[in-house]
């Protein structure tokens, strides 16, 4: 068996374990918190009084306009200067969540704003409250449009979690770095790490296509019923 293949096989369990233990939870939790934050920020931009909307615009401006790596460094290495000390994983989780929240807020705001105002008026005309109109009329239509860009954000986040290695989170890429430090085989190991990320991204992309097809059929049923 070739040396490179032997090394890849021997390293695979450690890499997969790091991915399962850190990369996957970090991705899922960051996206969940970021999506909730983004939804709240989008609603604030669209419906809250001016000062609150301005505060959200400032937050989005900061986190979309600065590099994610810099944000992670500020949280993990910078905050201790003012007495706020975080472990690596919570620091990464906060950084990724805030970053995802900024991007998803713009996606959600755009898709909510794209729903015709007549849908709101129709909902109010049959006695629905704002919450009922949002939950039963607006969100189902907006979700169909939001899934592709939100899915792309999630897939990008899977790859972005490799930046957590810079603040010592022992995720997939960091595990690869440690193996490189003992084997002195950077090309083989980093190719293997890249292939794992590629497989993850490909699986998620395939799932995205299936979800989009189902939503497209659902949208067709709605249009036919209308």
Please name every model-derived segment.
Residues 1-226:
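Transmembrane alpha-helices and adjacent helix-loop boundaries
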């Amino acid at each position: 068996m070739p040396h490179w293949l032997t090394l890849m096989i021997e390293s695979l369990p450690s890499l997969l374990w790091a991915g399962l233990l850190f990369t996957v939870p970090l991705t899922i939790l960051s996206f969940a918190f970021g999506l909730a934050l983004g939804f709240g920020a989008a609603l604030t931009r669209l419906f809250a009084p001016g000062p609150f909307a301005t505060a959200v615009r400032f937050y989005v401006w900061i986190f979309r306009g600065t590099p994610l790596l810099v944000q992670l460094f500020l949280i993990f290495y910078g905050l201790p200067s003012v007495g706020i000390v975080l472990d690596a994983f919570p620091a990464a989780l906060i950084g990724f969540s805030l970053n995802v929240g900024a991007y998803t807020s713009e996606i959600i705001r755009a898709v909510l704003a794209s729903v015709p105002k007549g849908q709101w008026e129709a909902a109010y005309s049959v006695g629905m409250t704002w919450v009922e109109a949002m939950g039963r009329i607006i969100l189902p239509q907006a979700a169909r449009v939001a899934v592709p860009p939100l899915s792309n954000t999630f897939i990008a986040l899977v790859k972005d979690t490799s930046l957590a290695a810079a603040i010592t989170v022992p995720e997939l890429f960091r595990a690869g770095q440690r193996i490189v430090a003992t084997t002195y085989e950077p090309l083989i190991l980093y190719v293997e790490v890249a292939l794992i990320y590629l497989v993850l991204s490909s699986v998620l992309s395939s799932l995205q296509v299936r979800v989009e097809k189902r939503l497209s059929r659902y949208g067709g049923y709605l249009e036919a019923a209308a």
